[in-house]
């Protein structure tokens, strides 16, 4: 019996993960080629070694959310350091995302620190309900902050222009990633 090469194994794994997502997308009635390719790519770019919890999640939305989160630089602010030791592409090293602190916050910008956006004990990203998350992304106001305050570093004016479906997909992906405590070593 012929053995599969590593590239073929990766392609097979992506196909196995993406197939249920694409099937769910098709049954949702909102299927188009662009969305399918983003869902598929989303599963391809989940950081190596990161285990997603897909139980009771919409797999198509998780894939789309991964595509948006992992292609939009979210780790640059919400993971510190962004890359694992020896995995910094800016140092011409093969990219390896720091999954030990993946999206657990801790990047300091003057008086501001990026939030831990992994799920809390109840499975809510950053402790926010879906409605609170969408409102934060549209208005920049974190419901945990005093009324009138807006996030000063988070590019919410840009993310707020995304469709509701895109923002729900981000939320669904964040629900699927492992919960982590706040980054124990905040810094620039």
Per-segment meaning from a language model:
Residues 1-12:
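Bacterial N-terminal signal peptides that target proteins for export
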Residues 11-21:
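Bacterial N-terminal signal peptides
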Residues 27-28:
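Boundary of Sec targeting at the N-terminus
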Residues 38-70, 84:
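Electrostatic cytochrome c docking/interface patches
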Residues 62-75, 89, 151, 156, ...:
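Sequence context surrounding c-type heme c attachment/ligation sites in exported
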Residues 65, 71-81, 133, 170, ...:
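The canonical Cys-X-X-Cys-His
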Residues 92-135, 156-167:
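Electron-transfer interface patches adjacent to heme c in soluble/periplasmic c-type cytochromes
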Residues 135-143:
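Glycine-rich, acidic and aromatic/proline-enriched surface loops and short helix-turn segments
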């Amino acid at each position: 019996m012929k053995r599969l090469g590593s590239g073929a194994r990766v392609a097979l794994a992506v196909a196995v993960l993406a197939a249920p997502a694409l099937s769910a997308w098709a049954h949702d009635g909102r299927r188009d080629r662009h969305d399918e390719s983003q869902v598929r790519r989303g599963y391809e770019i989940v950081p190596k070694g990161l285990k997603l919890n897909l139980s009771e999640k919409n797999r198509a939305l998780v894939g789309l959310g991964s595509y948006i989160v992992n292609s939009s630089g979210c780790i640059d602010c919400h993971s510190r350091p962004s890359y694992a030791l020896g995995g910094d592409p800016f140092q011409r090293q093969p990219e390896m995302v720091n999954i030990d602190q993946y999206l657990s916050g801790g990047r300091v910008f003057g008086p501001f620190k990026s939030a831990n956006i992994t799920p809390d004990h109840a499975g809510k990203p950053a402790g926010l309900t879906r409605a609170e998350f969408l409102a934060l992304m549209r208005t920049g106001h974190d419901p945990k902050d005093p009324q009138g305050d807006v996030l000063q570093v988070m590019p919410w004016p840009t993310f707020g222009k995304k469709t509701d479906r895109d923002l729900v997909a981000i939320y669904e992906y964040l629900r699927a990633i492992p919960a982590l405590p706040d980054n124990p070593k905040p810094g620039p």
